UniProtKB/Swiss-Prot annotation:
Enzyme class: oxidoreductase
Listed name of the protein: Aldehyde dehydrogenase, thermostable
CDD domains xrefs: ALDH_KGSADH-YcbD (cd07097)
Protein residues bound to NAD(+): G233, S234, N235, T236, V237, G238
Role played: Oxidizes several aliphatic aldehydes, particularly c6-aliphatic aldehyde and hexanal, but does not oxidize benzaldehyde.
Thermal dependence of activity, per record: Optimum temperature is 55-60 degrees Celsius.
C-alpha cells in the first residue's frame, strides 16, 4: 500500500533497534472518532519477525537474570520516570487511537507509571522461604527463578496499563519479553516501548512485534523458545493461545471475558447505585472486561432506580475524547462498532424492551466516527443473547428480582465470573453476596469496573485460566519454585 509521507510509520522493536517487518508491509491505525484521521502506520509482521524477537530475548535472558532484582528494578524506575514525562503525548495518542476520553487516557497512563514503580520495589523483596527440615543438620528452603522468555499478548482497550502490568513483573523477576500489542493500538504501544528504550534496558530484554493475532499472536503461542505466555483478550482467542501453549508444555495465563452483574438491593443508596452502574457500564464505551452488563434490581426499587438511571444517562455527552466536555467516546474500531450494533438488534429481535438509545450517532461530526448511543434494555430474559454473551459496548440489561438470593442465583447463571458488585446498606446482604457470588473481583457499593494494581486480579469459570495478575500474586506466574535441601 502507498504510505502518506506526512503520517509517521512506527516500527517493531527487536534487540534494542527499531526495525521494519521483513514483509515491508504496514497498515493504518485509524482514529475511531474520525475514520478519515490516520494516527500512524504500523507493521504487518510475519513469523520471521517473531523468530528474530524471540532469538534476541532468548540470548539476553541469562545476563538479565544474573543482575540483581534491585538492579532490574532500577530500570523500571527509569521507565516510570520517562513514562510520566511523556504522559500528555501518550494519553493524546491513546485517545486518538482507541477513543476513550483524554481524562481516562491520562489516568491510565499514570496507572502505568504507578505499576512500574510498584514492581521496581518488588525487585528488593523476598523470593523464597526457609522451611523447618526434619533433618537437624539440614537446611530446607525455596527460591524462585524466572520462566525465561515471556510472550505478552495485550488487548486494545487498555493499551498502556495492561502491557505494563504484564511486562513489569516479568522483567523484575528476571524474564525477557516479546510484546504483541493489539493492532488497533500499536502506535500507543510503540510510544510505551520507546520509554523502555530510553530507560536503557539492555538489548533483547524488551521486544515488540506488531501484526495480526493469527500470525504474530499465534506465532508467540506456538514458539518453542517462549517459556510463558500471558494473554488478555477474547475467550475464543484465549483458548487457542492456551491450547497451543499447553500442547508444548509452556506456562500460560489467560484473562478473558466477563458478563459482570450489579445487584441493587431495596435498601441501596439509589443515587450511588445509578452512578456506579453508569460509570461501570458506560465509561470507555463499555469496553472493559470488568464493565457492568447486567443489572439486577429488587422489585421494590426498580421503577425509581430506572427513572434515576434514565435521567442521568440523558446528561452524558458523546463525542471525540479530546473534547474536554466528552463523557463517552466511540467504539474503538469499525469491527467493534458493528458488533455492538448487531447485539442491540439481537436484543430487540429476541423481545427485550429498548428503553434508551440503541442507535448509531449521526449528528454532525459524530457521523465520521464509530459512535453508538448508550443503550438500555429492560424485560430481559436470562436466555437472551444480550444477557449471556459479552458485548463489550455501552449496553445495559435491567432485570427485576424478588430477593437478593434470586439476584445472586441469576447473576451466577453465566459462563463468566470476572467482576460483580452489590449496592446495599445491609451488611448481611453484603456478606451473603461475597460468599455466594461466583466472581474473582467483588465490589460492595462500588462499580464493577476498575482494579487496583497492588491487589490480585483475575476471574473464575471461563473468565480466566484461574491464575492471578498484579500485586504480589504476579510472582506466581512469572517464576518457578525451586525447593532446595542442603546437608551440613
Amino acid at each position: 500500500m502507498k504510505v502518506q509521507t506526512e503520517i509517521k510509520t512506527y516500527f517493531n522493536y527487536i534487540n534494542g533497534n527499531w526495525v521494519s517487518s521483513v514483509s515491508n508491509n504496514v497498515e493504518p491505525s485509524i482514529n475511531p472518532a474520525n475514520r478519515h484521521d490516520i494516527v500512524g502506520y504500523v507493521q504487518r509482521s510475519t513469523l520471521e519477525d517473531v523468530n528474530e524477537a524471540v532469538t534476541a530475548a532468548n540470548e539476553a535472558q541469562t545476563s538479565w537474570w544474573k543482575r540483581s532484582g534491585v538492579e532490574r528494578g532500577e530500570y523500571l524506575y527509569k521507565a516510570a520516570h520517562i513514562l510520566e514525562q511523556c504522559l500528555q503525548d501518550i494519553a493524546e495518542t491513546m485517545t486518538r487511537e482507541m477513543g476513550k476520553t483524554l481524562a481516562e487516557a491520562k489516568a491510565e497512563t499514570m496507572r502505568g507509571v504507578h505499576i512500574l514503580r510498584y514492581y521496581a520495589g518488588e525487585g528488593a523483596r523476598k523470593i523464597g522461604d526457609v522451611i523447618p527440615s526434619s533433618d537437624s543438620e539440614g537446611l530446607l528452603f525455596t527460591t524462585r527463578v524466572p520462566l525465561g522468555v515471556v510472550g505478552v499478548i495485550s488487548p486494545w482497550n487498555f493499551p498502556v496499563a495492561i502491557p505494563i502490568w504484564k511486562m513489569a513483573p516479568a522483567l523484575v523477576y528476571g524474564n525477557t519479553v516479546v510484546l504483541k500489542p493489539a493492532s488497533e493500538t500499536a502506535v500507543t504501544a510503540a510510544k510505551v516501548i520507546e520509554c523502555f528504550h530510553e530507560a536503557g534496558f539492555p538489548k533483547g530484554v524488551v521486544n515488540m512485534v506488531c501484526g495480526s493475532g493469527s500470525v504474530v499472536g499465534q506465532g508467540i503461542a506456538n514458539h518453542p523458545d517462549i517459556d510463558g505466555v500471558t494473554f488478555t483478550g477474547s475467550n475464543t482467542v484465549g483458548k487457542q493461545v492456551g491450547r497451543a501453549a499447553f500442547e508444548r508444555g509452556a506456562k500460560y495465563q489467560l484473562e478473558m471475558g466477563g458478563k459482570n452483574p450489579v445487584i441493587v438491593a431495596k435498601d441501596a443508596d439509589l443515587d450511588l447505585a445509578v452512578e456506579g452502574t453508569i460509570s461501570g457500564g458506560l465509561r470507555s464505551t463499555g469496553q472493559k472486561c470488568t464493565a457492568t452488563s447486567r443489572v439486577f434490581i429488587e422489585r421494590e426499587v426498580y421503577e425509581p432506580f430506572k427513572a434515576k438511571l434514565l435521567e442521568r444517562v440523558k446528561q452524558l455527552k458523546i463525542g471525540n475524547g479530546l473534547d474536554a466536555e466528552t463523557w463517552m467516546g466511540p467504539c474503538a474500531s469499525e469491527s467493534q462498532f458493528h458488533t455492538v450494533l448487531s447485539y442491540i438488534e439481537k436484543g430487540k429481535s429476541e423481545g427485550a424492551k429498548l428503553i434508551y438509545g440503541g442507535n448509531r450517532c449521526l449528528e454532525g461530526e459524530l457521523a465520521n466516527g464509530f459512535f453508538v448511543e448508550p443503550t438500555i434494555f429492560e424485560d430481559v430474559d436470562l436466555q437472551m443473547t444480550i444477557a449471556r454473551e459479552e458485548i463489550f459496548g455501552p449496553v445495559l440489561a435491567l432485570i427485576q428480582v424478588d430477593s437478593i438470593e434470586e439476584a445472586i442465583k441469576l447473576a451466577n447463571d453465566t459462563e463468566y465470573g470476572l467482576s460483580a458488585s452489590i449496592y446495599t446498606k445491609n451488611i448481611g446482604n453484603a456478606l451473603e453476596f461475597i460468599k455466594d457470588i461466583e466472581a474473582g473481583l467483588i465490589k460492595v457499593n462500588a462499580e464493577t469496573a476498575g482494579v487496583e494494581f497492588q491487589a490480585p486480579f483475575g476471574g473464575m469459570k471461563q473468565s480466566s485460566s484461574h491464575s492471578r495478575e498484579q500485586g504480589q500474586a504476579a510472582i506466581e506466574f512469572f517464576t518457578s519454585i525451586k525447593t532446595v535441601f542442603v546437608k551440613a
